Amino acid sequence: RDNYKAISDNTRKILQSFGPLDVNIIISSGSGGSGSVIAPSLATELLDNDQNVIVIVIGSSDSRIDIDNTLKTLKSYDAISQKRERPVVAAYFQNSAETSRSKVDESVVSVLFSLTTLFSRENRELDTRDLYNFLNYHRVTSFKPKLVGLTVHIGDVPADATEDVITVASVVKDEVSLSFIPEYRCVGYIS
């Protein structure tokens, strides 16, 4: 966090070098180091420019400092959401004694694959506006913007995973019924 000013001053230059896309996925550690400062700065700049952003945060419970830094990073994303009145959509993974780094890496790759499929522009009846509304749910639902969790399910969604659902974006071969009714849903069909 010591280098916040330098990072903040250069965030726009970083984004100009790479340019925003239909979806901008930011992957970083949440447990300290430059990633826990750079990632929120990038997310802030992208949200300020009305871009689609998904953050993937990898936390750690290896030490008290890691836990504290992870919580601070998540609080930073929540503050960004509150200040900008825009959702911050985050997939969270945690390195721990129970979940090895290699297992977390596999999970992150699986989520990335699912997101690239979802945002590929290759799915019938699913356009960029549908996906914009999926991420910016506050524009099409009664929910207020906040830091929200992104969960990816391949196959059926377990009943215990539907309690706090705000929006659903699906890519399917054929019409699929959900066992619950979200406020907003968009569906793409594999071409």
Outline where the language-model segments fall:
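Tubulin/FtsZ superfamily GTPase core signature
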Residues: 1-191
